[in-house]
């Protein structure tokens, strides 16, 4: 029992190095380093470089591209270098320091000739011996690695590659539930037991190895303990050793981690995986592990050689000149080179890139308010002239009268604004919102796309239930979609007919004899379909939609808003009346919409349309767990239209005029159109006028928004008909980049719309409405930071990771991806499960980046004490800031910006 508890504890702690990976059909952005944020970004970068040879800093090419495009100001970088050098004193001639800095900051690689020079070997050996004598490890530290990493096989590759191939084979067999006709035998018992049963007959193992498998314990924890003991791994190194194995295939391990969270009977899935992996490693390594002890010394020697070569190359000090110094002087030089290594300068380049963006964002806001200052009351805009090198920009509107208490009755009637449209904070909504506001008396609002509703949706047109909220939050309620009994019966029959056709096709494809006949039967139709889809993608997609609407038309549906008793549901179905009032009130507060209601309020979810795209869910709403957010929007709108809810809101101080109507639309991000999801049958005259005005303006809005968006796609030249071109891109099954998604996301602004209204933020900013004056205790701000801002940070870091380390954190080229086991994609037929974004999602061409890999900048419009209170009360967010996983800036009522570093 003690052993079992110890191993389970080790695995529980080791899981920090991977992230749960949901199936690709419900792809949700994940921060690959969420479990590591107790350490600083810089420390994690060093650790990953040591244990997996993964560099998470932008490389030389990315830095040079950023400089060339004006995204990175070199003077900012140079100032950072100067400041860093002033903080330390080195007993080294200044000209050597200057030469070293001037050379290493270019991020040039040290030529191999320097590493191979005999004098470098002599110096490295000298320092290694001195290190042994002094028992000093001040310059370097190596984490425990799997044994198989240190052993090279006959093909010249690490033995861990053979271990990986075995684990890919077995994990694919276990996970597959959708594609294969014959699933893994005994998988219902557990992954480990199913493997034990089958591996005894696997002839990729020798007869002796199969005998070892036959004698393994039935308990996976005991197996893990046995292998670790066999390899003579110290108990204090158990976690590091297990972490190395989890990082070997983080995609497959992440998928198992996800499944262990979803089903009680699979809660020990990672334990099973590690037991199998460690046994496979033991079988393949054999007795060679005894020679691995020498690996640490050889790595130390190699580290000294690299550092000596770096000093000689960057300082322009020949190795024979270095040898003329005494050992203490040499140690000083090498200590400097170790301290001022290339990663230090990569980090400075990254910080300079982020500071440049921060400065440019300030300038945009400042310029935006200066351009309208003449048209606004002096109490609404106050642009300070006190900008200088020692003071932050002072640019903000001092709009303490923006609520306009003197005209509250006028505002309640909403006469100046015809419609208010609440969009998801998704960066793709920013340009669309800007064009809507420019088209007429329309106001836009930013809120997370799940609209604050912690629900699991059970939609009639979806096979499985879906958690329609941020993935870090468990659902608390289930909402069912239903229709009249007759309509539902007809729809179910149509669904079953369609399903049986697809099932028959799949059955024929996966069986030997029918698969020989299938090409003859389906060939002509599929060939014609291929030709039509290739030549006329937009028309073929429209035709398919018409056929679907005719033969599988979804009936008019309702939602289970009111609480229902359902003994089959593990969650409460629907809400009580008080819960409806509470959720409506919270959502309206999060939208900063508690007064001045327009006649027509639209809650706009968003969705993306693309064809033949395994990663389509990555273009959906991240706040809804990789699905469209129209369902949540419809639920909230229907609640807000209820008289009893409005009466309850009135008692809480929120009065919604009787003439105000809530409706629902969906922003299609791939075509920049607004599709109506729910419009009440009865509209007041002024609400109807607003509805018609918005509809009349939409064609022009879509054209402008599509033109702006399509201009950024690399494969498009001049666009004469942007709406048609956008629809073609969304329909073309050969298009690898139907839209840019959330690429180039860089900031998250929490504040009043007046702060950014009319300013072109280039589709790089998440915008969330917030008024600190209405949030006396900071609860709303904490909610925004803990939910929407966290989702935005996860999205940001997933794009970041997929750009800086695409081989490890990305998913490769879409053209060579293989959908596997119904859960994800691989490159070819035997790779890790690729859990990041594809190359086409972040790069414009082979050597041209599109996404700018910088950490998220969170901007809060509030006084300093409000931000300080947030950091004091929210330790999780404060840790992200202090450990450099994101950047934080605030702007107060006087318009002064402050960076919280």
From Swiss-Prot:
InterPro entries: DabA
Subcellular location field: Cell membrane
A GO molecular-function annotation: zinc ion binding
Coiled coil region boundaries: none
A GO cellular component entry from the record: plasma membrane
Cofactor(s) in the UniProt record: Zn(2+)
Binding site for Zn(2+): 424, 426, 606, 621
One Pfam family in the UniProt entry: DabA
Keywords assigned by UniProt, alphabetized: Cell membrane, Membrane, Metal-binding, Transport, Zinc
Record carries keyword ATP-binding: no
Membrane protein topology class: Peripheral membrane protein
Magnesium in keyword set: no
HAMAP family the record matches: DabA (MF_01871)
Family: Belongs to the inorganic carbon transporter (TC 9.A.2) DabA family.
Annotated PANTHER family: INORGANIC CARBON TRANSPORTER SUBUNIT DABA-RELATED (PTHR38344:SF1), UPF0753 PROTEIN AQ_863 (PTHR38344)
Cited function: Part of an energy-coupled inorganic carbon pump.
Assembly mode: Forms a complex with DabB.
Protein name (Swiss-Prot/TrEMBL): Probable inorganic carbon transporter subunit DabA
Organism encoding this protein: Staphylococcus aureus (strain NCTC 8325 / PS 47)
Gene (UniProt): dabA
């Amino acid at each position: 029992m003690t052993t079992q508890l110890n191993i389970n504890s080790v695995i529980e702690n080791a899981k920090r190095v991977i992230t749960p990976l949901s199936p690709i059909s419900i792809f949700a952005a994940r921060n690959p380093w969420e479990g590591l944020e107790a350490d600083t970004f810089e420390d994690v970068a060093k650790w990953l470089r040591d244990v997996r040879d993964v560099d998470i800093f932008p490389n030389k090419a990315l830095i040079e591209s950023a400089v060339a495009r004006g995204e990175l100001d070199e003077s900012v970088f140079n100032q950072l270098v100067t400041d860093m050098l002033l903080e330390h004193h080195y007993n080294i001639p200044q000209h050597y320091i200057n030469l070293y800095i001037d050379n290493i900051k270019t991020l040039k690689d040290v030529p191999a000739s320097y590493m191979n020079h005999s004098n470098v070997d002599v110096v490295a050996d000298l320092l290694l011996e001195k290190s042994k004598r002094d028992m000093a490890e001040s310059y370097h530290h190596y984490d425990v690695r799997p044994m198989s990493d240190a052993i090279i096989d006959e093909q010249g590759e690490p033995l861990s590659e053979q271990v990986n191939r075995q684990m890919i084979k077995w994990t694919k067999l276990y996970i597959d539930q959708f594609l294969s006709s014959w699933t893994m035998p005994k998988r219902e018992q557990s992954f480990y037991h199913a493997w034990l049963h089958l591996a005894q007959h696997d002839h990729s193992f020798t007869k002796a190895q199969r005998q070892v498998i036959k004698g393994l314990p039935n308990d996976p924890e005991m197996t893990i303990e046995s292998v670790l003991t066999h390899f003579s791994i110290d108990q204090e190194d158990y976690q590091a050793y297990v972490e190395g194995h989890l990082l070997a295939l983080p995609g497959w391990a992440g998928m198992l981690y996800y499944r262990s969270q979803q089903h009680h009977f699979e809660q020990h899935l990672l334990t099973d995986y590690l037991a199998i992996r460690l046994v496979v490693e033991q079988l393949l390594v054999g007795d060679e592990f005894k020679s691995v002890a020498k690996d640490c010394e050889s790595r130390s020697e190699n580290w000294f050689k690299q550092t000596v070569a770096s000093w000689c190359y960057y300082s322009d000090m020949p190795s024979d000149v270095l040898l003329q110094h005494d050992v203490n002087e040499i140690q000083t030089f090498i200590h400097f080179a170790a301290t001022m290594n290339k990663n230090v300068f990569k980090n400075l380049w990254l910080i300079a890139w982020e500071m440049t963006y921060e400065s440019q964002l300030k300038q945009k806001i400042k310029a935006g308010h200066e351009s309208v200052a003449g048209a606004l009351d002096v109490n609404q805009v106050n642009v300070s002239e006190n900008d200088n090198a020692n003071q932050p920009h002072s640019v903000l509107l001092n709009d303490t009268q923006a609520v306009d208490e003197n005209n509250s009755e006028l505002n309640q009637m909403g006469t100046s604004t015809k419609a208010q449209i609440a969009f998801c904070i998704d960066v793709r909504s920013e340009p669309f919102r800007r064009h809507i506001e420019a088209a007429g008396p329309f106001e836009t609002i930013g809120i997370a796309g799940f609209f604050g509703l912690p629900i699991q949706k059970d939609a009639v047109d979806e096979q499985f239930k879906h958690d329609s909220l941020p993935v870090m939050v468990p659902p608390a309620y289930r909402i069912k979609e239903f229709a009249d009994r007759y309509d539902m019966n007809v729809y179910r029959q149509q669904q079953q007919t369609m399903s049986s056709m697809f099932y028959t096709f799949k059955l024929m494809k996966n069986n030997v004899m029918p698969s020989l006949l299938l090409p003859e039967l389906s060939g002509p139709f599929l060939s014609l379909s291929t030709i039509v889809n290739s030549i006329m993608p937009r028309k073929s997609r429209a035709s398919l939609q018409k056929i679907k609407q005719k033969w599988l038309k979804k009936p008019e549906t309702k939602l289970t808003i009111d609480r229902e008793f359902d003994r089959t549901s593990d969650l409460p179905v629907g809400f009580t009346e008080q819960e409806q009032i509470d959720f409506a009130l919270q959502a309206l507060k999060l939208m900063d919409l508690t007064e001045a209601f327009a006649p027509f309020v639209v809650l706009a979810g968003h969705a993306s349309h693309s064809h033949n795209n395994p990663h389509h869910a990555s273009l959906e709403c991240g706040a809804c767990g990789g699905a469209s957010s129209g369902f949540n929007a419809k639920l909230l709108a229907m609640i807000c239209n209820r008289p009893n809810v409005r009466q309850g809101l009135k008692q809480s101080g929120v009065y919604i005029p009787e003439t105000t109507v809530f409706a629902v639309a969906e922003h299609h991000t791939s075509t920049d159109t607004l599709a109506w999801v729910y419009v009440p049958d009865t509209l007041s005259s002024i609400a109807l006028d607003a509805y018609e005005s918005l509809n009349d303006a939409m064609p022009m809005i879509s054209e402008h928004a599509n033109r702006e968006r399509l201009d950024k796609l690399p494969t498009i030249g001049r666009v004469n008909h942007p709406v048609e071109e956008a629809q073609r891109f969304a329909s073309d099954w050969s298009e690898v980049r139907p839209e840019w998604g959330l690429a180039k996301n860089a900031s998250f602004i929490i504040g009043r719309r007046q702060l950014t209204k009319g300013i072109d933020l280039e589709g790089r900013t998440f915008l969330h409405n917030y008024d600190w004056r209405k949030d006396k205790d900071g609860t709303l701000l904490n909610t925004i930071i803990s939910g929407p801002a966290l989702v935005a940070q996860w999205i940001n870091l997933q794009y970041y990771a997929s750009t800086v380390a695409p081989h490890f954190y990305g998913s490769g080229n879409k053209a060579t991806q293989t959908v596997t086991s119904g859960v994800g994609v691989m490159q070819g037929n035997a790779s890790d499960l690729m859990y990041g974004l594809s190359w086409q999602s972040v790069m414009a061409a082979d050597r041209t980046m599109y996404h700018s890999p910088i950490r998220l900048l969170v901007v809060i419009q509030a006084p300093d004490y409000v931000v300080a209170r947030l950091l004091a009360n929210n330790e999780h967010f404060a840790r992200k800031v202090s450990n450099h996983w994101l950047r934080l800036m605030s702007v107060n009522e006087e318009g002064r910006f402050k960076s919280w570093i």
